[in-house]
Amino acid sequence: MKNWKTRTKLVHSGTKRSQFGELSEALFLTQGFAYDTAEQAESRFINNSPDEYIYGRYGNPTVRMFEERMIAIEGAEDAFATATGMAAVSGALFCMLKQGDHLISSKALFGSCMFVVDNILRRWGIEVTLVEGTDLNQWRDAMQPNTKVCFLESISNPTLEVCDIAGVAKIAHEGGAKLVVDNVFATPLFQQTLKLGADVVIYSATKHIDGQGRCLGGVVLGTEEYIQDVFIPFNKHTGPAMSPFNAWVMLKGLETISLRCEAQAENAEKIINALKGHKNITRILYPTDVSHPQYELAISQMTKGGTVVSFELSGGKKAAFSFLNALEIITISNNLGDAKSLATHPVTTTHKNMAAEAREAAGITDGFVRLSVGIEDPEDLIVDLLEALEKV
C-alpha cells in the first residue's frame, strides 16, 4: 500500500470488509458494542486499541476507515475524526495548553478560529500573541519560555495569505513548541504540511473532503504519540466525535476529491486570468498567480494554488452586494470546497464578529469577496462573473 499513488490511496486506503464482502465500505450505525465475555470487555477497556471498539464516542469501524484513509494521503502516523472542523481546531489546541502557557498565532484566521484563539484561550488564562504570519521575524520575536504552540492557516481564510510552514516550524521547534497548521484551503492534495515540518495538521472535512455540502466533520492528524496520548484522552471525554454516517459520506467524498480539486484549481486559474485588470476589481488574490505577494513561497510548498479566488471590488459593500446579487450560476453561500461555485462577503458573514479594525488590518475590506470555485464549465463561470461585474 505504501507505494500506491495518491489517487489509488483515495479510493482504497483504509477499507476493511466484513464477513459479507460488501463492495462499498460498511456503515456501522451503532452507539455501542457487544462483548462475547466479561473478560473480553475487560480486555478492551485495558488495551484501548483503535481497532477494538467499546463506545461510539471513542471510536467506530466506519470512522476508523475514514481516519486511515486520511492517514494514508497525509503521510501521518495517526488521526482522529471529529464532529466538525472547529471541533478539530479547538481540540487540537486545547489538549496541548493549560493556564500559564503561551500560544503564538497568525493574525490571518477564519472568524471562528480567531474567536477560539483571541477570546476563549485568553479567558482560560492562556497567553496569546498575534503576529503577521508572513513575517518570520515576528514569530521569532514572539517566542517565550512558556510558548507551547504556534498556530497558523496556510492558505488563510479569506485573504489567501501563505505562511512559510518550514520556517515557522523551525522557530517553534527551536523554542520547544509544536506547530499546528490548518490546511483546509490548500488540501492534502496541494500541500503536504507534515512533510514541511508541522507537528499537527487540521482539516474541516466539511469542505473539500465531503465536497458536496452534505455533512459536517473534521480530522486531526499527527504522530501516534500525539493522537493517542494527548489528543484522544482530551477528545473522548469532551465528546466531539464524528458520526459514522458522516464518516461514510467523507469516505465517498475522498474517492473523488482529486478529480474535483484538480478541476477546481484549473477553473480558478482561468478565472484569475479572465478577471485580471477588470475596471471594477482593485485587488485579486490567488496563491500561485505571479501577482500574489507570496507567490515564490507558494510555488515552493504547494503543487497548485487551491480552489479559492478572492478579490476586492471598488465601491465597498454596496458594490459587493450588487455583484453577488447579480450572479446566476454561482451561489451565495459561506461554505467552500463544494462542487458548486460559491461566493460570500466575509465582512458580513464569516468574519462578521471580528473587530472592524482587525478586519481592515487583515485586508478584509467592505468590498472583499471570496469565491470558492466549483467544477462547472469555466467558460460559464467566467461569463457569470463578468456579467455580474458589469452590474456593479
Which residues does each predicted region cover?
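N-terminal "arm"/small-domain region of PLP-dependent enzymes with the aminotransferase-like
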Residues: M1-N60, E68
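Active-site beta-loop-alpha junctions enriched in small/polar residues
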Residues: I155, V184-A186, D289, S314, ...
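Short, well-ordered beta-strand elements within core beta-sheets of diverse protein domains
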Residues: M250-L259, T307-S314, R370-G374
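Conserved PLP-enzyme active-site core in the AAT-like
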Residues: R7-Q19, A79-N280, L285
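Short loop segments at secondary-structure junctions
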Residues: G32, G222-Y226, L254, L313-K318
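PLP-dependent enzyme catalytic core of the Aspartate aminotransferase-like
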Residues: D118-N119, E127-T129, D141, P145, ...
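Conserved small-domain helix->loop->beta segment predominantly found in fold-type I
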Residues: E269-D338, M354-E360
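Conserved N-terminal alpha-helix of the aminotransferase class I/II PLP-enzyme fold
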Residues: T37-A87, S112-N119
